[in-house]
């Protein structure tokens, strides 16, 4: 997943470069046009397009997922893996990168949404958990970061639907709560997983993922029928692995 996120971010940057080049060619071809204010057929001034620094008309172009928000999700997951493996020195370095990415989020990156406002508080608690080597707290909080990043993403029309990221989040929740033998949280996670999958399944099928969807159906059914922490734990890894397959449907050339 980290590699795919990095590729997605690289693709975004490549797209920005193409947009800049295209904008430059357009500017050159338009150089002979009069600079007088454009008017409509009725003689009233025409509305000028809202151009951003990349020369993209933001009044019509869909907003692009900020690379900083993609980085928050990536570093959150990286930190989860570091805490899971007990690699605390690495975890502290990832925490620094996560903080930098979060501080660099654009003002428009849903920063004032409920999820955006929660993020700084979660990061403060996460940094303390990493500093104190509190494994369970670090796992819970780093996974919460991935959840918040996913919830802040839909308005940007990410290449991979945010619900796919939420399936990944739920798989990690199954790991966390099965290890804690927390039946209440496991049932809650199972319900969340089912709702998320129901929401995104049609889009997966539209992207040629009929077989992948059927496999995910069976995994979600296994979670729904699980009775013990061990049963939840056994299906967590297959779900996380299969989310990689689902993501591949959206990132393949």
Segments (PLM) and residue ranges:
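C-terminal motif of bacterial Sec signal peptides marking the signal peptidase cleavage site
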Residues: 16-19
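Mature extracytoplasmic or organellar-lumen-exposed domains after removal of signal/transit peptides
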Residues: 21-253
């Amino acid at each position: 997943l980290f590699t795919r996120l990095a590729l997605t971010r690289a693709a975004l940057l490549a797209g920005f470069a193409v947009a800049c080049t295209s904008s430059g060619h357009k500017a050159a071809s338009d150089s002979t046009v009069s600079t007088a204010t454009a008017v409509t057929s009725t003689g009233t001034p025409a509305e000028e397009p809202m151009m951003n620094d990349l020369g993209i008309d933001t009044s019509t172009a869909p907003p692009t997922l900020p690379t900083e928000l993609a980085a928050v999700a990536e570093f959150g997951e990286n930190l989860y893996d570091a805490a899971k493996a007990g690699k605390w020195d690495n975890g502290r370095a990832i925490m620094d990168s996560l903080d930098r990415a979060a501080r660099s989020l654009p003002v428009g990156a849903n920063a004032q949404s409920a999820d955006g406002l929660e993020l700084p508080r979660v990061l403060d608690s996460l940094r303390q958990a990493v500093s104190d080597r509190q494994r369970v707290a670090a796992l819970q909080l780093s996974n919460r970061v991935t959840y918040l990043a996913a919830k802040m993403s839909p308005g940007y029309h990410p290449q991979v639907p945010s619900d796919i990221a939420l399936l990944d989040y739920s798989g990690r929740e199954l790991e966390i709560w099965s290890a804690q033998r927390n039946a209440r949280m496991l049932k809650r996670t199972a319900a969340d997983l089912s709702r998320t999958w129901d929401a995104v399944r049609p889009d997966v099928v539209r992207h040629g993922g009929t077989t992948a969807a059927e496999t995910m159906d069976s995994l979600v059914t296994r979670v729904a029928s699980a009775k013990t922490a061990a049963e939840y734990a056994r299906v967590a890894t297959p779900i996380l692995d299969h989310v990689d397959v689902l993501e591949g449907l959206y990132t393949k050339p």
